[in-house]
UniProtKB/Swiss-Prot annotation:
This is Acylphosphatase. PANTHER family: ACYLPHOSPHATASE (PTHR47268:SF4). It catalyses: an acyl phosphate + H2O = a carboxylate + phosphate + H(+). Belongs to the acylphosphatase family. One of its GO terms (molecular function) is acylphosphatase activity. SUPFAM superfamilies: Acylphosphatase/BLUF domain-like (SSF54975). Its EC number is 3.6.1.7. Pfam families: Acylphosphatase. Gene3D superfamilies: 3.30.70.100. Residues 3-90 form the Acylphosphatase-like domain. It comes from Geobacillus thermodenitrificans (strain NG80-2). Keywords: Hydrolase. InterPro entries: Acylphosphatase, Acylphosphatase-like_dom, Acylphosphatase-like_dom_sf, Acylphosphatase_CS.
Length: 94
């Protein structure tokens, strides 16, 4: 198992990017969360099998027709074994 913390820069707010992230995470059976930050970035944590996490990161970095990723900051985090879902967070709270 692997868990990553990611901050994504680019055109990633107001373009459905969080929903795209959640969809891609659920496709790969990942858990974690995603949220918008006040500075225009999107922040997330994702956890799952190492190969699934890497494929997820590659897909997120490619963006969508509307979302353009210019930079991703990725850090390893401790696995949370009790986490069961991947959720979109609103209002900036964890």
């Amino acid at each position: 198992m692997k868990r990553v913390h990611v901050i994504v820069e680019g055109r990633v707010q107001g373009v459905g990017f969080r929903y795209f992230v959640q969809h891609e995470a659920l496709k790969r059976q990942l858990t974690g969360w995603v949220k918008n930050n006040d500075d225009g970035t999107v922040e997330m944590e994702a956890q799952g099998h190492e190969s699934a996490v890497q494929l997820f990161l590659d897909t997120i970095e490619a963006g969508t027709m509307f979302a353009k990723v210019s930079r991703m900051h990725i850090e390893q985090r401790d696995v949370r074994p009790d986490e069961k879902q991947f959720r979109i967070m609103y209002g900036g709270g964890l």
